[in-house]
Amino acid sequence: GDIDGVVQQSRLNDINPSDIADIQILKGAAAAAIWGTRAANGVIMITTKKGKKGLNIEFSSSLSLDYVNREFQKQDKFGQGVNGNWAANNALSWGDRIADRSGSDSFNTSGAKFVSEDGSVQYPITHKGDQTTYNQSNRDQVFRTGVTWNNNLSISSASEKGSVYFSASDWNQSGVLAGNSDYRRTTGRLNFDYNVNDNLKLSMKNTLAKVFSNRVQMGSNLNGLYLGYLRTPADFDNSDYLGTYYNAAGVGTMNSHRGYRNYLGSAAPTYNNPGWTLNKQVNTSDVTRFIVTPELQYKWLENSTFIARVGYDQSTDRRITYFPYRSAASTSTGSFGDNFITESELSMHLINQSTHKISDKISMDATLGYLYTDRNFFQIGGSAINFIITDQDRYGFFNSTNDNMTPFNSISRVLNDRYYGMFDFDYDDKIFLQLATAAEASSTFADRFWSPSASLSYEFTKDMKIPTLSYGKLRASWGRVGVAPPAYITGTNYVSAGSAS
């Protein structure tokens, strides 16, 4: 491929780690019993902090430095070429032995040339005699010391009537790649709860995150970083990657791209020069995310509590990709993409939790619940190729003609609801039985799906005193879970076909 190679980040990154109080992992059927088919592979439950008694103000600031501690070794014995002979623009590094060269290059200064941004000139080489190798300088073009500043402020307070927790954070990172490789996350959070009386409690959690990132193409990718970097011969200097190419008639082409597969920059090289990938190409993501979760807890019986929770999570993500004119492969004529994505999820969760003492040694915790979710996805954007203006960096659709633009959009909505029950039995605090069942319906499949599960565990170290074993448990479980299909896979799509003569 020539444009793949930028992996979008997990939205878990939107959470400030300093706000996290607890993380729990629920696996398999136990997770699906509560959270449904989306949790068939497990659930990560993250609990954020709440206020502490008194007035608490905390501030932290940290600086981290990142280094690449292991790299691929590159040979420096043989030059560019094949069969023991130096050859310009060749893909391989099986040329002549560098140490056996005469010590200086010969050039043709009467024809084409490449003038780099700093004024240095590259002429066609007629004889390769220079013994200089560039593995170290080429490496230094790619890697740098990564720098991360992490600042956190939190203010919290609590009393008998409730608590409040406020935080703000800023994570600012420049990566170890010496170019368009950076990440910045700014967050704010406000959590509070209020005890109306002994039986009624109100709470709300709010968070806002702003995340901007710019990432470098990677992988087996003609526009990627490592393909061109690792294949660069030891005797080729990657530093002058950008400049003006002049043909034999003296006509100049600005914004030309020079790499070891085209060392005069007369056309796009087969692989990008790493400097071009790092500094000219753009892959940005600009995310704004807002989450609000109000909750009501009402203790309506001595052993029963009713919980009503509503959650709304919305994020917008604008992604821009830019490959300048004379990038590698199919993007050699320029490519631009602008993609705007909005995702939202509305959830309503009704839960009743109760505790029952059956006998002196047997107790049961019962959870009955209903969960409704409404997920929406909207995407609109377009791509443009074959740039009109090629000697300058121009971002936007205005730099292509209409027939070189491709608009696109996508809309998706998925509704789910589920009823569930979970019953946990405890015998003498050593034998535990859990029985659960759920009935789920989704707009992506027709029939309501039942997912029963059961688990039995025995903490045998309560009865067997084993000096070398402080804790031991035997556990067996069974469950049936399913995964809902994606939206609209049973639909018949209309695609406008082109005409051919």
Segments from the language model and where they lie:
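Residues on the lipid-exposed face of transmembrane beta-strands in outer-membrane beta-barrel proteins
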Residues: 48, 147, 153-157, 190-194, ...
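Extended, hydrophobic alpha-helical segments in both membrane/secreted and soluble proteins
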Residues: 20, 188-190, 304, 348, ...
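Transmembrane beta-strand segments that form the barrel wall of outer-membrane beta-barrel proteins
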Residues: 170-172, 433-445, 476-478
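Surface-exposed loop/interface segments of Gram-negative outer-membrane beta-barrel transport/assembly proteins
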Residues: 53-133, 176-184, 189-291, 307-417, ...
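N-terminal periplasmic accessory domains that precede
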Residues: 33, 39-61, 127-132, 153
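Short acidic/polar hinge/loop motifs at secondary-structure boundaries
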Residues: 1-27
